[in-house]
From Swiss-Prot:
Organism taxonomic ancestry: Bacteria, Pseudomonadati, Spirochaetota, Spirochaetia, Spirochaetales
Reactions it catalyzes: alpha-ribazole + adenosylcob(III)inamide-GDP = adenosylcob(III)alamin + GMP + H(+); alpha-ribazole 5'-phosphate + adenosylcob(III)inamide-GDP = adenosylcob(III)alamin 5'-phosphate + GMP + H(+)
Main location: membrane
Essential cofactor(s): Mg(2+)
Protein name per the record: Adenosylcobinamide-GDP ribazoletransferase
Compartment annotation: Cell inner membrane
GO CC list: plasma membrane
Gene assigned in the entry: cobS
Annotated membrane topology: Multi-pass membrane protein
Family, per entry: Belongs to the CobS family.
Amino acid sequence: MKGFILALQFFTRIPININIDFNEKNIKRAFYFLPLIGGLIAGLVLIPIYFLPQKYIEISGFISLLLYLFLTGSIHLDGVGDTIDGFFSARKKEKILEIMQDPRIGTYGTIGLNVFLLLRYINYSTIIPDAGLLILAGIISRLSGLAVVVFSKPAKDTGLGLLFHKSASKFSFFFWLVLVCFLSLFTPEIAAFSKIQGTFILVERLKYLLLPLTAFILTFIIIRISYKKIGGITGDVNGLIVELTELAVLSTSFFINVHL
């Protein structure tokens, strides 16, 4: 339970007044629960969407957006703004890292944040009747973040990034990878919170593996860009990956339903 509580305390703003030592052992445990935390956040964000009348979907979508910002403390969105500011500055590594650490936000970061917030609001206000997709997208996006911590190198030799890299377990990633691939096969049922309708045909369900595949391809691309720009990964870059892959999973699901 220490890992779960620490994950809640670090990755959400849910008030839990329990003192957990922030050490390598407990951090390792916390990463086992990271994808679960993503699903939990998405589930809580669903409450206004699912229980308010559909005719008020624009209002419930806005409330859900505010709830998401509150639950996460904008921890990942902060990384979106910082990363976009740094990467679009066309500077050398040291200057890019300096820009990313600057608490002020620049023009590129402001534009990027507004785009991400708009896309998230659009998803929240149009996702009915596939609201359950938010939970699957939340899980997959945090799995992408876990992949970054496990398999990429930090851009700096100090700080939380290095501690996380040392603490994260490959087993936790592969455990969740298998589970996510299994869950993806049941995307229609998860989306609608329903039982299997008709006969389950595995070949027809394989298309839903595009959901985690899209997330991992995007993750790989951003990692390569980050290596080229700053020689590794920072928490800000990981925040961008989490936000981007969540939106990508939702968009990919829409594409599958319409075209495949």
